[in-house]
């Protein structure tokens, strides 16, 4: 009987040690979900994300103060408006006179400035105005205007991480098939070959 008691005590001690070992294993700091270090790290990430969101909100509010048009939240509509706007923009520049008068040059300059300020997407408008400030509108000829427009479009493409457009074909690509008053088509054929 003494042996049974000793054996029973040994089993109880082993079981108790096993339970204590399992408890220690599952409640250790390295494995615990409630580990202060992990909570601190997670809260640090949340703080960084929160700060970034606040900074973005502040940036958007500042943009809204500086633009006429409101922000455009619908990305699908923003892309559709963008495609249509670029088509109009490039076609307009490709139709500009070869040798514009000072009045025509001023009108194009004014129009592009208003086009940028009144663009229906507030954030896009803000960036477009900043680009025009950095890269002023070129109005000396059709080629200068079209190449400037292509350069500006490529700056937007860079910002949006899109492919860069080959500006060498801009006048051909936006030749609307229209004719001058003398019946000649407006296209790259009318332009002298541009070197450089």
From Swiss-Prot:
Result of changing residue 121 to A: Loss of function
Major enzyme class: oxidoreductase
Positions of transmembrane segments: 13-35
UniProt-annotated location(s): Endoplasmic reticulum membrane
One GO CC annotation: endoplasmic reticulum membrane
Residues annotated as binding FAD: 78, 83, 86, 127, 150, 153, 157, 162, 174
Database matches in Pfam families: Evr1_Alr
Topological relation to the membrane, as annotated: Single-pass type III membrane protein
Highest taxon of the lineage: Eukaryota
Residues in compartment: Cytoplasmic: 1-12
Reaction(s) catalysed by this chain's protein: 2 R'C(R)SH + O2 = R'C(R)S-S(R)CR' + H2O2
Enzyme Commission code(s) on record: 1.8.3.2
Primary residence: endoplasmic reticulum
Keyword Transcription regulation assigned: no
Effect of residue 124 to A: Loss of function
UniProt keywords, alphabetically: Disulfide bond, Endoplasmic reticulum, FAD, Flavoprotein, Membrane, Oxidoreductase, Signal-anchor, Transmembrane, Transmembrane helix
Known role: FAD-dependent sulfhydryl oxidase that catalyzes disulfide bond formation in the endoplasmic reticulum lumen in parallel to ERO1.
Something else known: Present with 259 molecules/cell in log phase SD medium.
Self-association and partners: Homodimer. Interacts with the substrate protein PDI1, forming transient intermolecular disulfide bridges.
Protein name: FAD-linked sulfhydryl oxidase ERV2
Taxon lineage: Eukaryota, Fungi, Dikarya, Ascomycota, Saccharomycotina
């Amino acid at each position: 009987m003494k042996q049974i008691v000793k054996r029973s005590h040994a089993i109880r001690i082993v079981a108790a040690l096993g339970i204590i070992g399992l408890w220690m294993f599952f409640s250790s700091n390295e494995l615990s979900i409630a580990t202060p270090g992990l909570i601190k790290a997670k809260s640090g990430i949340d703080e960084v994300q929160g700060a970034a969101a606040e900074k973005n909100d502040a940036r958007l509010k500042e943009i809204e103060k500086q633009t006429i048009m409101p922000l455009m939240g619908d990305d699908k509509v923003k892309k559709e408006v963008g495609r249509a706007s670029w088509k109009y923009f490039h076609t307009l520049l490709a139709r500009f006179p070869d040798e514009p008068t000072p009045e025509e040059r001023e009108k194009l300059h004014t129009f592009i400035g208003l086009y940028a300020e009144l663009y229906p997407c507030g954030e896009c408008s803000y960036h477009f105005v900043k680009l025009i400030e950095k890269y002023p509108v070129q109005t000396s000829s059709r080629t200068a205007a079209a190449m400037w427009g292509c350069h500006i479009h490529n700056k937007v493409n860079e910002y949006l991480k899109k492919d860069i457009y080959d500006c060498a074909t801009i006048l051909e690509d936006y030749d609307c098939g229209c004719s001058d008053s003398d019946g000649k088509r407006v296209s790259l054929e009318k332009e002298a070959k541009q070197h450089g």
